[in-house]
């Protein structure tokens, strides 16, 4: 399994719609609002890196999403 956090900026006035749509994407385990440079964080789980990529791209194409930055968990 591959875990990642996607930091998301939303379009002004589209926050609620974006959060709802992000939460419906398969592989999204948790979605929550944050204060600061980003508006929303989504915790993801995917089978592997090849599965994670399309999942992140799908989130980035959702209505109201204007920017994403993905942080992939590494083993330590």
Predicted regions mapped to residue ranges:
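A compositional/biophysical signature of low hydrophobicity enriched in polar/charged and small residues
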Residues: 1-76
């Amino acid at each position: 399994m591959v875990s990642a956090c996607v930091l998301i900026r939303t379009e002004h006035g589209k926050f609620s719609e974006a959060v709802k749509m992000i939460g419906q994407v398969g592989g999204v385990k948790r979605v929550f609002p944050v204060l600061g440079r980003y508006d929303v964080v989504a915790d993801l789980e995917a089978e592997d890196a090849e599965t994670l990529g399309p999942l992140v791209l799908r989130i980035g194409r959702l209505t109201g999403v204007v920017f994403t930055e993905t942080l992939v968990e590494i083993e330590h």
